[in-house]
Amino acid sequence: MTLPATGGLPEGPPVRTRIGLIAPFDLALDDELARWIPDGVSLHAARTPRLPGPVDLNLVERLNDHDQILACIGELGAIEPAAYAYACTAASFVDGITGEHALAEAIRLAAGVPAVTTSGALLAALTALEVRTVAVAAPYDIVITERLVRFLAEAAITVTGYGSLGLTSRIWEVPYRTTAELIRRLPGTGAEAVLLACTNLSSYDLIAPLEAELGVPVVSANQATVWAALRLIGRRAVGPGQALVERT
């Protein structure tokens, strides 16, 4: 095989800044998370061990196992991520604000680089948008959903109303129509934004049209996770028509 002269070859391979994604065992939306990633950045995931049982409070509490979460850093460390994101909403809010801070700090100390959790990212996103009142839509059962409402209250975020789908498995299969209807029928008035929980609930293509319909930002768990992780490395997310991406 004859190769062209050196001058005819493209420069490469491309230089990319890597983000390490620590995911729960059942995360199925890696492809959606990647849609917010700009050129020059790549996302690399490691998963915590599989746990049997439905997605209920017991499983969520078991997911928040620092040893298992930090073991993922060992799996990803060889490629030297510039930042880490723990991509599970419920496991990062289940122990409240103190628990979220402790988890994020444990990841930062173990990795030696900046880190964020999904719940911390959601709070950062609401702060960036100057939002203090939200309506909450979640796929979980009511027990987990109310734990999220309590977490937000700890952060001085007022929840005007909330609704849940009551699901305990296969959340990634929820149709956009189902999520949109859940958001439209949320109780209460006066919310400055809608918060859409769970990194296994698909949202990318819903955000812009729902924001246009509702007239307020729609902040999803996946959107906020990638947005916050990119901010740690000085980059911006890709999300045409999405308030969080375009206003902050």
Label each region the model flagged.
Residues I73-V116:
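Glycine/small-residue-rich loop that forms an oxyanion/phosphate-binding "nest" at active or ligand-binding sites
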Residues P4, T17, V41, A110, ...:
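Hydrophobic structural segments
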Residues G166-W172, L214-V238:
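Short, flexible loop segments at boundaries between secondary-structure elements
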Residues A82-A87, A135-V136, A191-C198:
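Periplasmic-binding protein-like
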Residues L103, I107-G166, E246-T248:
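Conserved beta-alpha
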Residues T2-A71, A137-P175:
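N-terminal glycine-rich anion-binding loop in soluble enzyme alpha/beta folds
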Residues D65-I79, T179-A191:
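Short, well-structured alpha-helical segments in soluble
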Residues L186-L210, V226:
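Hydrophobic alpha-helical
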